């Protein structure tokens, strides 16, 4: 079988690399520990005593004696104390104490490995053009998506465990909002949003009915269109709920990063990075793509500028470039988050009253402690967009070349396979060959049911939906942090 050929070798080599090399040379660790990120250290109690002008306390009458032990009152200092936090570069030792660091490192490093496997497989398919092999890189991409969704689910459940129900209410509210939004989008005709979902589902239903007829069963569609869209909307609502806080956090980091940026080019890239999901959403709006990109009006005539296949390829490349830009701007956003420690201290100085030294230390240390949570909220949507796009290219039978070319198909000689099944092979080896051939026929039948048209429509919609959810939540977060919070 072709399945145990070059692709399996590539998978085994990459598994060995992940086990032997990545623990020593990790991209996830380098993104945090390359020396560009600086975190704020919390002041010690002795430093706070000196700043507050207090001497080391001895035993006083105010101390309580309880079961033979003396409990002293917690030390408090004025909030308007002249405190300046010291910074330090993030090192590998510092990351050991970070919450969710193993999950962050695993997701990023596994994504790198899966992307390399995908690239090698694409080169192999481009030159060798195998027709009877399973594309193992698809399994890697699906694993990446499952890990990203699992991490986002874990982060979302963390908000449900908090005693304060504010975060829980936000997740539930946005979940219902995205469910209604998904149902509304799925009702819109393809004259406005060109996912190809209707065409793909119709092709799936027809192929399934033909398959059932060949098996001598009643020729009914396995699932109705309404049921399909209902369950798809439920899945989309969960994705939207998972992306709620990543979008809200992105908006806050975007505003803080803009305040830190001094160069015009950096500010421009930050704006493009924030609007990247909107650009992705507009790529599937048919009036824009058909009337202004593919057939731009020049005078009284509209001249075709490119074919649909060329535009599909350009759309894939644009999404990948925007994902690369988001990864490049990761450092600016994480540094903007780390600066929240000093920002909280500056805000505290404007308030009246006193604060305990323990609370002050917790307020400063908490920012760095949750650095990997913020990094996951930044990286996970990026990973989902990237690998959904890669799946769209492969399963949707698109091409990477922008020049017109015939789209390759994967023909399966069903007649030859069927003849092999019913050929008489009395030996044990012959029976094994019959079993293998029957499995091959079953897989080819599944290929005829789950066609590229179905995957193209479904994955186009999911890619668009992830970008739409991310932009919706980040836009709401921008409005909230800009106008509804007290500066």
UniProtKB/Swiss-Prot annotation:
Which residues are modified by glycosylation? Answer: 34, 135, 203
Q: Name one GO biological process term.
A: regulation of cardiac muscle cell action potential
Sorted alphabetically, the keyword list is:
Cell membrane, Glycoprotein, Membrane, Transmembrane, Transmembrane helix
Q: Name one GO cellular component term.
A: plasma membrane
- What topology does it adopt in the membrane? Multi-pass membrane protein
Cross-referenced Pfam families, in alphabetical order?
A: Tmemb_161AB
Does Plastid count among this protein's keywords? no
Superkingdom of source: Eukaryota
Q: What does this protein do?
A: Essential for maintaining normal cardiac rhythm in the developing heart and for neonatal survival. Inhibits potassium and calcium currents in the cardiomyocytes, this assists in timely action potential repolarization and thereby maintains normal cardiac rhythm.
Q: What's this protein's name?
A: Transmembrane protein 161B
State the taxonomy lineage: Eukaryota, Metazoa, Chordata, Craniata, Vertebrata
Gene that produces this protein: TMEM161B
């Amino acid at each position: 079988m072709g399945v145990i050929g070059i692709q399996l070798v590539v998978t085994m080599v990459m598994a060995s690399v992940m086990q032997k090399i990545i623990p020593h040379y990790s991209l996830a660790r380098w993104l945090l520990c390359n020396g560009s990120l600086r975190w704020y250290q919390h002041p010690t109690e002795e430093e706070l005593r000196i700043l507050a002008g207090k001497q080391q306390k001895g035993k006083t009458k105010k101390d309580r004696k309880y079961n033979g032990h003396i409990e002293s009152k917690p030390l408090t200092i004025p909030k308007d104390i002249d405190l300046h936090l010291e910074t330090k570069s993030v090192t590998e030792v510092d990351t050991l104490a970070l919450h969710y660091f193993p999950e962050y490192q695993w997701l990023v490093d596994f994504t790198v490995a899966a992307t390399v496997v995908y690239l090698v497989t694409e080169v192999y398919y481009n030159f060798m053009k195998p027709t009877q092999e399973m594309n193992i890189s698809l399994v890697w991409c699906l694993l990446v998506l499952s890990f990203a969704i699992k991490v986002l689910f874990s982060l979302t459940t963390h908000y449900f465990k908090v005693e304060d129900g504010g975060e829980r209410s936000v997740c539930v509210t946005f979940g219902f909002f995205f469910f209604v939004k998904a149902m509304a989008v799925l009702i819109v005709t393809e004259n406005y949003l060109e996912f190809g979902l209707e065409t793909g589902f119709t092709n799936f239903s027809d192929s399934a009915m033909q398959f059932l007829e060949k098996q001598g069963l009643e020729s009914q569609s396995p699932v109705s269109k309404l049921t399909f869209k209902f369950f798809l909307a439920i899945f989309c609502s969960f994705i939207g709920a998972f992306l709620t806080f990543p979008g809200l956090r992105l908006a806050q980091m975007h505003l803080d990063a803009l305040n830190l940026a001094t160069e015009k080019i950096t500010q421009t890239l930050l704006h493009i990075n924030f609007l990247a999901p909107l650009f992705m959403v507009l790529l599937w709006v048919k009036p824009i793509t058909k009337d202004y990109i593919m057939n731009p009006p020049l005078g009284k005539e509209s001249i075709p500028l490119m074919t649909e296949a060329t535009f599909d390829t350009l759309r894939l490349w644009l999404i990948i470039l925007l994902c690369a830009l988001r990864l490049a701007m990761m450092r600016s956003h994480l540094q903007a988050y780390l600066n929240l420690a000093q920002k909280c201290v500056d805000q505290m100085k404007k308030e009246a009253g006193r604060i305990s030294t323990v609370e002050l230390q917790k307020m400063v240390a908490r920012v760095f402690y949750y650095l990997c949570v913020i990094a996951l909220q930044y990286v996970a949507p990026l990973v989902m967009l990237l690998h959904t796009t890669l799946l769209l290219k492969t399963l949707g039978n698109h091409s990477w070349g922008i020049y017109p070319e015939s789209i390759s198909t994967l023909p399966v000689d069903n007649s030859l396979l069927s003849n092999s099944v019913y050929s008489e092979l009395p030996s044990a080896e012959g029976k094994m060959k019959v079993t293998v051939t029957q499995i091959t026929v079953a897989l080819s039948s599944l290929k005829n049911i789950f066609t590229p048209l179905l995957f193209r429509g479904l994955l186009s919609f999911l890619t668009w939906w992830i970008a739409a959810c991310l932009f919706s939540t980040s836009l709401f977060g921008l409005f909230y942090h800009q106008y509804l919070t007290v500066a």
